[in-house]
Amino acid sequence: MKQAYQYLFNLINEKEIVVVGCSGGPDSMALLYMLNKIRSVKNIYLVCAHVNHNIRMVSKEEQLFVENWCLDHDIVFETMTIQKYGDDNFENEARTIRYKFFDDIVRKYNANYLMTAHHGDDLMETILMRIVRGSTLN
């Protein structure tokens, strides 16, 4: 975690705006925690963007957990709840909706960064998505 913190600290400049995609899971909460620590030193502006996928009994509880954490730490909280999914591949549709929401929030705040926490499987998914779209891996 020290290496991740140091990387983020070196990456982000004073007074930049960072949108954090936060599910409420351990990876995204660790990212939000680290960015909040950096905020106290570099005076960055943090916006937490949470998507309630509305698919599990605890979805609302997760949303409230993240919302309350942000409130306790004076972080702007933006959320959306997905009410209905189509008949297509659920994971693809959820991902498309989630990143459209993140893009909207980045534009709303004119953010310098959108940050999401990835574990190994997520990272592979990101690499594959970039290859399919013809993007670079940087």
Short names for language-model regions:
Residues 1-22, 26-138:
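Core alpha/beta nucleotide-donor-binding catalytic domains of modification enzymes
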